[in-house]
């Protein structure tokens, strides 16, 4: 592809292939005084130094449609959540994610493109340099486009993304374990001194039967955040003693809570992972939370949920089958999140440099 043909008919991908070396290079407007000039002057970056590797052009009509579709999809969760919050009627499953993970509803509502998408935008005629909801903190705008700019990352933010990426890679490379059968929710109410969700749901079994099950079944919870809510009397019964420091070594891809956490890590990786991946992770987390609570000792009949009775062999088989199904859905989301983080971290140096 020649530079002349590129200028005449812009490609959806801002890349050119060098025939002599076969390498991918990026064509990019030269920077002048913090802004991109007209496309008559270009620099070609080497493979090692290229900004994005491949940057996809998103025409205004395309990304506007994506944003509208995303907002409609997110509204299925955020509108009812706001209504329940205003009425003081929390849902033990659907509202848990907004309480356990303290991210605003607006984070789901607002569409952000994510790394590698170069969105058309006429800042000269628009009322603002960037579209509504697109933060100047992490995005760069030109006269004609805007994009998520990893050059705006601070060292602290880069280190946080690096840690998240390392954790996700460690989990992805580990064999799944499906032998826990959701005992963590039972261990949390062992002894009856503290029942976490008693404000929204009552227990479906007598305390003595709950305690007997916890004390008679093997508990092998590998998730730090779940384990830390165990009743003090149940913690010694767990085969593992996970800590914040050991989570990279212990968390595994079969774990309901580790897979639910994909929403948390995606939220922490915003705007780099993009809103569509964030919402994909959230929707999976809703299903995981549903499994979590249906297998718990709580009575959710008021909320239209049928219990998975893990106190029985049939219930444990049912739980394991559902756990495996959801873990298979979590795996590609984890890989997408890892890919977005790797791409961001690979190009975290500022794009607006001297050449």
Task: List where the protein language model places each region.
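Cysteine-centered motifs
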Residues: 37-39
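Active-site acidic/histidine clusters and adjacent loop/turn architecture
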Residues: 47-167, 303-354
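Glycine-rich, often proline-containing surface loops adjacent to acidic residues and nearby aromatics
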Residues: 134-148, 179-186, 257-262
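Short, positively charged and aromatic/hydrophobic N-terminal segments
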Residues: 15, 24-26, 41-45, 50-54
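A contiguous catalytic/ligand-binding core that recognizes phosphate-bearing ligands
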Residues: 148-246
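Low-acidity, Ser/Thr- and Arg-rich intrinsically disordered low-complexity segments
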Residues: 2-22, 28-32
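Charged low-complexity "KEKE/polyampholyte" interaction tracts
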Residues: 242, 250-355
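Alpha-helix initiation and capping sites
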Residues: 4, 30, 179, 220-223, ...
